[in-house]
């Protein structure tokens, strides 16, 4: 399960600044959803190759009376969803009554909480945080979120201990892997393969979308039942339900983010739709079905959720629900809108269905299998290098400082999503347009469908870069005599 970190504190203590720095963006990856407090943001972040979800809660009112209400409305929900809470205070403003009230609430929870003193730039950190020890939350971590000072230390001391279950990417000797495969292929031998067989594993399938777009109806239709489930896994409200199923002799695990879902029992919009459940289901899935309401069209929330799916690198199938009952004219308008707003993801299949009546639902699984097979397909180093060579022959890389960028070889760097690692000289100077050209060339050459391809570039380091020449004693004596001769000639 992907860890969840909540940022809590008074207004203007720097929560959004820290959120943007952690998620490396200037806004939330997933925008506000109907039924949820508007000023809560959700984003995807990473530290040392380990992923986590960050929640930016709105500022809590500055009065003790207001704290109780606002905590119940939004911040308390974020705390319950989180694995770790970062309680932020303003070192410049000093200790405030609202800080004490918030700390009182946090101490009553058994949630790991860490006190972060922001805006310590230009101050003596030890002196600036001394008053906050009275909050009784242990060690204080001074940072300057706007400049990034102390943020890395905060991540290492707070987040990494809670991420043992999310292992970083394995480091391999990529050059050795390349030459081993190349030599084996030149000798007519089969390249060594690992024991991983993606076809032997069930496909984890997540159905996500905004409230009331028909996710539960589609889930019921797939399972052939009148209800999704009448029980939930024990734990917090962010637990999702994993439902094993089989279709056409292929095993699946359906990830249900709806929680307890007896029809007519749930009326609270927040209870119906949990952003955290959705984000964690996306991270855990192999293939994501993004459900869109044909009658409402694509909203900004749909695009924000789509952005999170793409950033997570998951395979994607777009499902346009409630297609029945629309006139032909309206259907054409919907298709034109889809082409216009989703033109940047031409690799994803789009299905028009009616989950209520079942039309088109059976065709979804063909696209799901296609997307899964594309994302887990093993491609040899020799083939990737040949494709790279053909791409270079069709369109040469640009000149950088008068020299042509040289691409040497390519190999697989990961799967789900497929990652192609290209080694060469001056590859860091390649323009984005040429990188997109290479990505599209690989996708078309490999006939990848339902998943994006990521291209990573690695450049050989110059061992003499930023190093002064070291002279032998004989060379030093010659240099000394030469310098004396130059001075005399002047």
Swiss-Prot record:
Keywords annotated in UniProt: GTP-binding, Nucleotide-binding, Repeat, Ribosome biogenesis
Record InterPro entries: G_ENGA (IPR031166), GTP-bd (IPR006073), GTPase_Der (IPR016484), KH_dom-like (IPR032859), KH_dom-like_a/b (IPR015946), P-loop_NTPase (IPR027417), Small_GTP-bd (IPR005225)
Presence of the UniProt keyword Repeat in the record: yes
Domain named KH-like: residues: 377-461
Gene3D superfamilies reported for this sequence: 3.30.300.20, P-loop containing nucleotide triphosphate hydrolases
Binding site for GTP 1: 9-16, 56-60, 118-121
Alphabetized GO MF terms: GTP binding; ribosome binding
Taxonomy, superkingdom: Bacteria
Record-level GO BP terms: ribosome biogenesis
Pfam families referenced in this protein's UniProt entry, alphabetically: KH_dom-like, MMR_HSR1
Alphabetized PROSITE patterns for the sequence: G_ENGA (PS51712)
Ranges of residues in domain EngA-type G: 3-166, 203-376
UniProt binding sites for GTP 2: 209-216, 256-260, 321-324
Subunit structure and binding partners: Associates with the 50S ribosomal subunit.
Family membership: Belongs to the TRAFAC class TrmE-Era-EngA-EngB-Septin-like GTPase superfamily. EngA (Der) GTPase family.
Summary of the function given for this chain in its UniProt record: GTPase that plays an essential role in the late steps of ribosome biogenesis.
The protein, known as: GTPase Der
């Amino acid at each position: 399960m992907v860890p969840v970190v909540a940022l809590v504190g008074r207004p203007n203590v720097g929560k959004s600044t820290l959120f943007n720095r952690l998620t490396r963006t200037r806004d939330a990856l997933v925008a506000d959803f109907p039924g949820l407090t508007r000023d809560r943001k959700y984003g995807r972040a990473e530290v040392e190759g380990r992923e986590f979800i960050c929640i930016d809660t709105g500022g809590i009112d500055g009065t003790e009376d207001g704290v109780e209400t606002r905590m119940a409305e939004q911040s308390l929900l974020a705390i319950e969803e989180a694995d770790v809470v970062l309680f932020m205070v303003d070192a410049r403003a000093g200790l405030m009554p609202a800080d004490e009230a918030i700390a009182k609430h946090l101490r009553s929870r058994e949630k790991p909480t860490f006190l972060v003193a922001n805006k310590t730039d230009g101050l003596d950190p030890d002196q600036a945080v001394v008053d906050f020890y009275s909050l009784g939350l242990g060690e204080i971590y001074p940072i300057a979120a706007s400049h990034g000072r102390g943020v890395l230390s905060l991540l290492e001391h707070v987040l990494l201990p809670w991420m043992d279950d999310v292992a970083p990417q394995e480091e391999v000797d990529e050059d050795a892997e390349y030459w081993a495969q190349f030599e084996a292929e030149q000798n007519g031998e089969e390249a060594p393969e690992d024991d991983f067989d993606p076809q032997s594993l069930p496909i984890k399938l997540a159905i996500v979308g905004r409230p009331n777009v028909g996710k539960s109806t589609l889930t019921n239709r797939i399972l052939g039942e009148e209800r999704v489930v009448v029980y939930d896994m024990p734990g917090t409200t962010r637990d999702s339900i994993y439902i094993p199923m089989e279709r056409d002799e292929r095993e699946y695990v359906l990830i249900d983010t709806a929680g307890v879902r007896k029809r007519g029992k749930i009326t609270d919009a927040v209870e119906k739709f949990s952003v955290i459940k959705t984000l964690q289901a996306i991270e855990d899935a192999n293939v994501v079905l993004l459900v869109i309401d044909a009658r409402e069209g694509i909203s900004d929330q749909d695009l924000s959720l789509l952005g999170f799916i793409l950033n997570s690198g998951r395979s994607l199938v777009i499902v346009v629900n409630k297609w029945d009952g629309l006139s032909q004219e309206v259907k054409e308008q919907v298709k034109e809108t889809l082409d216009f707003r989703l033109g940047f993801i031409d690799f994803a299949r789009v299905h028009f269905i009616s989950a209520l009546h079942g039309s088109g639902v059976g065709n979804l699984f063909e696209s799901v299998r296609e997307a899964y097979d594309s994302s887990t397909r093993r491609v040899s180093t020799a083939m990737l290098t040949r494709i790279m060579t053909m791409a270079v022959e069709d369109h040469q890389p640009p000149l950088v400082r008068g020299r042509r960028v040289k691409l040497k070889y390519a190999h697989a760097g990961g799967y789900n999503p497929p990652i192609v690692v290209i080694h060469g000289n001056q590859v860091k100077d390649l323009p984005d347009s040429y990188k997109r050209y290479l990505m599209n060339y690989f996708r078309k050459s490999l006939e990848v469908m339902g998943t994006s391809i990521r291209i990573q570039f690695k450049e050989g380091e110059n061992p003499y870069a930023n190093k002064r020449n070291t002279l032998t004693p004989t060379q030093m004596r010659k240099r000394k005599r030469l310098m004396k001769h130059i001075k005399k000639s002047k």
